[in-house]
Every structure is written in C-alpha cells, then in structure tokens.
Curated annotation (Swiss-Prot):
Gene Ontology biological process terms in this record: isopentenyl diphosphate biosynthetic process, methylerythritol 4-phosphate pathway; terpenoid biosynthetic process
Residues at the site labelled Transition state stabilizer: H49, T148
Subunit annotation: Homotrimer.
Annotated S-S bridges: none
Binding site for 4-CDP-2-C-methyl-D-erythritol 2-phosphate: 17-19, 49-50, 76-80, 147-150, 154, 157
Residues at which a divalent metal cation binds: D17, H19, H57
Organism for this UniProt entry: Ehrlichia chaffeensis (strain ATCC CRL-10679 / Arkansas)
The name this protein goes by in its record: 2-C-methyl-D-erythritol 2,4-cyclodiphosphate synthase
Amino acid sequence: MNQHPNKPIFKVGIGYDVHKFDNTCYNDANTFITICGIKINYHKKIIAHSDGDVGLHALTDAILGAVGCGSIGQHFPNTDNTWKNIKSDYFLIEAQKKAQEKGYSISNADITIICEQPKIMPHALEMQEYIANLICIDPSCINVKATTTEKLGFLGRKEGIAAQAIVLCCLQN
C-alpha cells in the first residue's frame, strides 16, 4: 500500500554520456580507461574532466532524472575543479543518496556501452558486480551490455565511447 498517496510508487530515469578518446596512441601496458568502475587496458585515453567513466556517468544521470533531481552536469559541473579527475563512484553514490532523500531506492538498472573498441563484454559481469557492490543492491539487479554502431559515425570511427542507462527507482516503505 502506498503510504505517500501523492508520490508515484515507481519512477524511471534515462541517462546518456559520451566522451572523446585522446588521439594519441599509447604503447604503455599501464594505459587504461575506466568503464563502470573497471579498469580496461586500452591504447587510448578518455578526454574528460573527471575519470570519464561513461557507464557510471549515464547511470548517475538516470538516477538523478528518475527522482527529479536534475542532471549530473548540474550537481557536478565540469567547470568546477572540485570534480577534476574525481572517481565517478562518488557521483553514483551521491545520486543514490539523493534518491534516498526523496524516499526512493534503486530497484534495477540496465546500462549499454556503445563503442567499437575496447571490447566490453569480457568485463560485463565484473562491472555489474562492482556497481551492485557500490550501491548495495543484488548483482542480478544490474545489467551491463555493449553494442557498436556498425562502424558508423564518430563512435564507429573509434573517436569516442558512449553509454546509456535506464533505472527503475521504487518508493521505500
């Protein structure tokens, strides 16, 4: 039974993020990008104000949108040096706190990473577990998958990486 008759029981949010790759080709074995909290070896770096984790940025944006709290750019603007090089875990945890303050918990999330390279699926399970642990929900409630743009556009030319996320938030009792 809904104890808050003016609040919807379910809220859905959609998030999207994109970052450009640095054109420099790095041969260092320690070169990596971070996607959904997991470091993946890759010969290019992401150009970003924070750590450039498109997966966590999209999920953060989805959560904020679901509970009517604006966007990641409003809360953590790339014009503020407070957020320079910060790990995106912080953004996600703060978004979850804002959802809880509004009386909502995260029920489940689905994240799609869009890129030609690096290959995401070998890391998807680890990403799901990482996110679930970060926001304290069952790993079965997080899904990470990947797709390409069939070599079309800037993503197809391997100039960047994108992510979209959808989240279901439920009213807490």
